[in-house]
């Protein structure tokens, strides 16, 4: 952890809503005049798309579980190194994973390369004179044998829907965006399950703040293609670790007054309508980030 070069980490599985948090942070950074060094979690995967398929096929042939959720498919060492070096110096290295033809064209023009979607760009230095590091991905607080990213994050945010909702989103979006059948996606869920249990879920016991979306419609059977519950058909439980609540001085009466229809379910949790999730994030996170930057300025 570092007051001079803070690390903010948002962790959650694919489709969990981390993009909503990312947008909230973007608004905060713009309003506060903050320049972040932004790092995407999938750029620290171990394999490019083709190599990942080969590694997965080899693991399946051996009867082994292998997925992007686990350590064997990721460079936790490089990510931990980035968090550590940034906290010490404000520097480090990052790269990009190319998701689309458009992204590939953008970065090929920068590097003079001919990379395709599914490949990584070369490693490059973090831009100089950034105010903080912002990570968004699967493993922002992962802890295991030989690595501990949690201890290096100054603020760790978890974004995790209730598991039936997560599966509904995964199955339905894979069908709509990739043409996968429900059965094919269920096979993926089953293959990933050991890594999900051992490497994704434990992070949410270590976060400073968790945002958990809970649907208010029937999601009893998530294993078929169906309509994804809308934000207004959901609640979001916002849980604060006691240490984080005390450290950041979370003002619950203020939040209850500002967020219509919100209520406290426990002394450390507030519940809001799903449609208010982004607004709640900005109310909660703006003073935290502001204080981080003020602390940074006080020792610079």
What are these regions (language model features)?
Residues 34-40, 44-109:
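Conserved nucleotide-sensing/catalytic segment adjacent to the nucleotide-binding pocket
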Residues 142-147:
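Conserved ATPase-coupling elements of RecA-like P-loop NTPase cores
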Residues 1-5:
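Phosphate-binding P-loop
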Residues 12-13:
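P-loop (Walker A) phosphate-binding loop of NTP-binding proteins
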Residues 115-128, 132, 149, 163-300:
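C-terminal accessory "lid"/substrate-recognition subdomains
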Residues 21-22, 26:
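Post-Walker A alpha-helix
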Residues 18:
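Conserved lysine of the Walker
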């Amino acid at each position: 952890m570092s007051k001079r070069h803070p690390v903010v980490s948002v962790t959650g599985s694919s489709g969990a809503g981390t993009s909503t948090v990312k947008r909230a942070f973007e608004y905060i950074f713009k309003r506060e005049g903050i320049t972040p060094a932004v790092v995407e979690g999938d750029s620290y995967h171990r394999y490019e798309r083709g190599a990942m398929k080969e590694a997965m096929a080899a693991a399946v042939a051996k009867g082994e579980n292998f997925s992007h959720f686990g350590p064997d498919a990721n460079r936790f060492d490089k990510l931990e190194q980035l968090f550590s070096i940034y906290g010490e110096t404000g520097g480090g290295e990052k790269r990009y994973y190319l998701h689309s033809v458009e992204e590939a064209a953008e970065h090929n023009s920068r590097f003079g390369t001919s990379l395709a979607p599914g490949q990584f760009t070369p490693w490059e230095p973090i831009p100089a004179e950034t105010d903080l590091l912002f990570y968004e991905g699967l493993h922002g607080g992962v802890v295991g044998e030989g690595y501990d990213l949690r201890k290096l994050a100054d603020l760790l945010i978890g974004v995790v829907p209730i598991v039936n909702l997560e599966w509904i989103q995964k199955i339905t979006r894979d069908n709509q965006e990739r043409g996968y059948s429900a059965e094919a996606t269920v096979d993926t869920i089953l293959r990933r399950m050991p890594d999900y249990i051992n490497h994704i879920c434990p992070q949410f016991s270590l976060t400073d703040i968790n945002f958990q979306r809970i649907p208010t419609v029937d999601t009893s059977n998530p294993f078929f293609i169906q309509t994804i519950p809308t934000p207004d058909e959901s609640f979001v439980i916002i849980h604060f670790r006691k240490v984080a609540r005390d450290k950041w001085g979370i003002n619950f009466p203020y939040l209850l007054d500002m967020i219509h229809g919100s209520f406290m379910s426990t002394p450390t949790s507030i519940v809001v309508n799903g449609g208010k999730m982004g607004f709640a994030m900005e109310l909660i996170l703006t003073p935290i980030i502001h204080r981080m930057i003020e602390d940074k300025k006080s020792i610079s």
